[in-house]
Amino acid sequence: FPYTFRYGRTGGLYELTRQNINSKNVVTRLYVYGGSSNLGDKYRYTRLCLPGKAKNASYIEDAAAIAAYGLKENTKIFDDIRPERYGEVTAAGSAYYAFKDATMNFDLNEKDSAGNTKWLIDGATAKVKFTTGNLAGYEFDIHKYDHATKEIQVVPFTDENGMKFPSETSAAFQFGVGDKYFFTDINLPDTYKTDAENKLLAEGNKAITEYSQPQVQYGLSIDENFIRQFAGELTVVNLFAVGDYIPVEDEDIGVNKSVRITAFTRDLLREYKYNITLGDSV
């Protein structure tokens, strides 16, 4: 709905009444972590952390909520946020089990000054997993990478039905130009970790904004003339529906969010007269 309803500031246009406030599950300090893949053994924790934060400092807090409700801690893990490099098949490889990716911007075989591999992990097999194309959802061990030609060779496998992937003969189960994939079980360059950490921070900020506010329930009665300016003359169709979200601001208890419509009644004779119940719980 294109309007924010503010508690205590109606101007005669609507009445927003508090029906229930539950601060039991409020979180004012949220520890935030990401996934555990592609970090390497030199990363500061087994899971992705917030930018520049060690394990025990990987949290976001809301000072205003702490002042109102005290320090209340919880943890949120975003398993799907991790360093990832999404690549693309740009050309066929030298064999049915190979493909080329001209966008590859680091040498998978690179070693440091001590002769240790920088991106391959000891004891782990690097893999590619496809997200689009005929082999979407399939994961393959990497057999060989040639940085000069940007060719990746994978290890074919045979499933329980005797089907071989990728197929040597059927184009329906082969790599295709434009197919998307990503690496797993490798140590990606730091730029990918930085990107993932920033994404984790953004999602963490969204989460603390939600968790630091109490669970609420409101009753909302809106003036008919106020409704009419939004609905026009389309009185047959309901302007509101259960499951819609309406922006609510209640400064006294720190609420500034969209709250779900859990129920409403509409007068059959006065098409613009609505009584709405808003709540965080269904």
Where are these regions (language model features)?
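An acidic/polar, Gly/Ser/Thr-rich interaction patch typically located in mid-to-C-terminal regions
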Residues: 9-282
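Short, conserved phosphate-binding/catalytic loop or strand-edge motifs used
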Residues: 1
